[in-house]
């Protein structure tokens, strides 16, 4: 087997798969090094892709010809567009996936990728050349592979430890050993490191659940694919069911809280704020006597894992016997059998402030990091980072300039900027609220924002490039025609569109920004009604958002200018609309005396600053 490559990617999780595929698409001879081939693309925690903010990242991965969206479409068994009742900027495409089908889809897509080799092995050391740059990897069995750039996507494996109650053992995932030697090596290199934790709930036996007693949660009647390349969703679609914890559940948790790995002192690393364990929920929200649980099928019946159910909402590290009591206190699960108990896993991460915006370590050139090693949580966050790291590793190995994606261009850019400039104190999860440009960073326009650039970067294949060019041209033509075609009030009123009889002509874009019905639009512009739905939806959304986009740009300019505003010493950040609980806590702890000082509080996002500025103006 070849031992010389342009790029080596360590780790076959979501970040590693995207990194390896991206580097190979760019023409780099790439090696994906993983513990086991059969676990490539495994969904370690929840069997779902996408969500609010996360779905945007999946669409951005797809726009740059990544794998995740296509794999989710091939494996999806329950599609739902979250926030459908709200504006398109915060729509969150999400899909439950059959774990076995998703893993197979990722492996098939990698097998179809030119310039890519896959090898089994555990990375134990990095090769660092005389210039202090990463030059390859040494496996624990002594094999060496050299490369012009290395991408490390270790997930939860760096000195990982699994905890169930007070029992713990080294592991990166259930049944898989941790990367202990590699963690030691990174620490010896002087990288700024810390510990974080995440967790997962018990897996339940599908046949032991009282399904008929539980409310049904159906997916969308017409599933909307993640990928622009997907023509149709072929899998049968399944429903989820909804239940909830009870006061008895909470009493059990409080009674045995000292046995939890987190609250019993066994774990030092912080867990994800926005995906808390059930112990965290009971402690942090003591006034509540119930928390919702979604019972999500892990696979289609008859497929591997088809007898398992994922109870979304009750991640835990309590002892296995207490978990059983907890499960039996929940409606519909009174006789449920636990197939595998939930657990917490603690692992090493590298402070992402040590990274350049390209995801290259500034202290160790040619080594790129992506995924949970950078302090993030979630498949989508990992996959997006992996794609950028693989793209930049290929360019670095080939002598090209690195690419940094601006936060005004993509949620990926928002995430990287947040990580590299602010660091993390807990696992970072993407939300639409983190983006100050979210009106223009929609899930439905990811390709229009990024695919053209991806073509120039060399990471987009010909099939996607041709589709993108045709759709972009159709949208541009429709936008121009809708902006040029105008109507007098009489014509609009005759079509059933309510406007002021002021004699002023209105363009079709003006009309689309109103509450005019599709039938009324069809009467005045039959050509528009005949457009492909993707084209007409985009034009309509742009028309409706045009005023907001102008205001957004103005607010951003004001944000940059108004740094001298003073803040009251007794300002109650909990009363400021638009601030997440995380932002409230950070500002309340820092108590900045001025708006300028607020901008320097670690972890404060631009969107939080705009909410603060708006509040101060209102009360002034």
UniProtKB/Swiss-Prot annotation:
Q: Where NAD(+) is bound, by residue?
A: 271-285
Give one GO biological process term: tRNA methylation
What is its quaternary makeup?
Answer: Homodimer. Heterotetramer of two MnmE and two MnmG subunits.
- Which SUPFAM superfamilies does the entry link to? FAD/NAD(P)-binding domain
What are the record keywords, sorted?
A: Cytoplasm, FAD, Flavoprotein, NAD, tRNA processing
Q: Which GO terms describe its cellular component?
A: cytosol
Cofactor(s) named in the record: FAD
One function term, GO molecular function aspect? flavin adenine dinucleotide binding
Q: Which family does it belong to?
A: Belongs to the MnmG family.
Quick check: keyword Flavoprotein in the entry? yes
Can you tell me which residues bind FAD? 11-16
Would you say which domain of life the source belongs to?
Answer: Bacteria
Q: Chief subcellular site? A: cytoplasm
The answer to whether keyword NAD applies is: yes
Tell me, in a sentence or two, what this protein's role is.
NAD-binding protein involved in the addition of a carboxymethylaminomethyl (cmnm) group at the wobble position (U34) of certain tRNAs, forming tRNA-cmnm(5)s(2)U34.
Q: Where in the cell is it found?
A: Cytoplasm
What is the name listed in the Swiss-Prot or TrEMBL entry for this protein?
tRNA uridine 5-carboxymethylaminomethyl modification enzyme MnmG
* Name of the gene encoding the protein in the UniProt record: mnmG
Q: Which organism is it from?
A: Gluconacetobacter diazotrophicus (strain ATCC 49037 / DSM 5601 / CCUG 37298 / CIP 103539 / LMG 7603 / PAl5)
């Amino acid at each position: 087997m070849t031992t010389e490559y342009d790029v080596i990617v360590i780790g076959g999780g979501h970040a590693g798969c995207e990194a390896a595929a991206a580097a190979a698409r760019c023409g780099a001879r790439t090696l994906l090094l993983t513990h086991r081939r059969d676990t490539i693309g495994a969904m370690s925690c929840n069997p779902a892709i996408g969500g609010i903010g996360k779905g945007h990242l999946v669409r951005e991965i797809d726009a740059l010809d990544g794998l995740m969206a296509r794999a989710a479409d091939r494996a999806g068994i329950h599609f739902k567009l979250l926030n459908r009742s709200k504006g398109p900027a915060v729509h969150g495409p999400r899909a439950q996936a059959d774990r076995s089908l998703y893993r197979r889809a990722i492996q098939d897509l990698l097998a179809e990728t030119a310039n890519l080799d896959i090898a089994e092995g555990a990375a134990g050391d990095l090769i660092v050349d005389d210039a202090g740059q990463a030059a390859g990897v040494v496996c624990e069995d002594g094999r060496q592979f050299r490369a012009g750039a290395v991408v490390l996507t270790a997930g939860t494996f760096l000195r990982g430890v699994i905890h169930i109650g007070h029992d713990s053992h080294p592991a990166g995932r259930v049944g898989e050993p941790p990367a202990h030697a590699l963690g030691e090596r990174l620490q010896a290199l002087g990288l700024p490191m810390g510990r974080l934790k995440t967790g997962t709930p018990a897996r339940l036996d599908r046949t032991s659940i009282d399904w008929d007693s539980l409310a049904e949660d159906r997916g969308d009647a017409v599933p909307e694919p993640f990928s622009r390349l997907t023509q149709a969703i072929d899998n049968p679609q399944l429903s989820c069911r909804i239940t909830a914890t009870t006061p008895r559940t909470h009493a059990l948790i409080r009674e045995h809280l000292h046995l939890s790995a987190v609250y019993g002192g066994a774990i030092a690393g912080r867990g994800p704020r926005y995906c808390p364990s059930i112990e965290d929920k009971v402690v942090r929200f003591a006034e509540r006597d119930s928390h919702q649980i979604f019972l999500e099928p892990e696979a289609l019946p008859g497929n591997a894992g088809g007898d398992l159910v994922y109870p979304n909402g009750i991640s835990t590290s309590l002892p296995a016997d207490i978990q059983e009591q907890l499960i039996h206190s929940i409606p519909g699960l009174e006789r449920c059998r636990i197939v595998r108990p939930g657990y917490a896993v603690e692992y090493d991460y590298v402070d992402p402030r040590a990274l350049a915006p390209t995801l290259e370590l500034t202290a160790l050139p040619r080594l790129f990091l992506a995924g949970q090693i950078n302090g993030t949580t979630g498949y989508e966050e990992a996959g997006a980072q992996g794609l950028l790291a693989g793209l930049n590793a290929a360019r670095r190995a080939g002598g090209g300039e690195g690419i940094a994606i601006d936060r005004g261009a993509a949620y990926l850019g928002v995430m990287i900027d947040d990580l590299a400039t602010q660091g993390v104190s807990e696992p970072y999860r993407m939300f639409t609220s983190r983006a100050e440009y979210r009106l223009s960073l929609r899930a439905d326009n990811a390709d229009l924002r990024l695919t053209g650039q991806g073509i120039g970067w060399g990471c987009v294949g010909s099939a996607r490039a041709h589709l993108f060019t045709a759709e972009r041209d159709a949208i541009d033509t429709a936008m121009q025609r809708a902006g040029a075609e105008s109507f007098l009030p009489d014509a609009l009123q005759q079509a059933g569109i309510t406007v002021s009889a002021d004699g002023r002509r209105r363009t079709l874009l003006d009309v689309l920004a109103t509450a005019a019905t599709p039938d009324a639009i069809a009467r005045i512009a039959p050509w528009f009604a005949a457009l492909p739905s993707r084209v007409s939806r985009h034009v309509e959304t742009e028309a409706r958002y045009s005023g907001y986009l102008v205001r957004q740009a103005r607010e951003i300019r004001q944000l940059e200018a108004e740094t001298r505003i003073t803040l009251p010493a007794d300002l109650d950040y909990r009363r400021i609309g638009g601030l997440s609980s995380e932002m409230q806590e950070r500002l309340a702890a820092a108590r900045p005396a001025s708006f300028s000082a607020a901008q320097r509080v670690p972890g404060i996002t631009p969107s939080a600053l705009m909410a603060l500025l708006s509040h101060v103006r209102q009360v002034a």
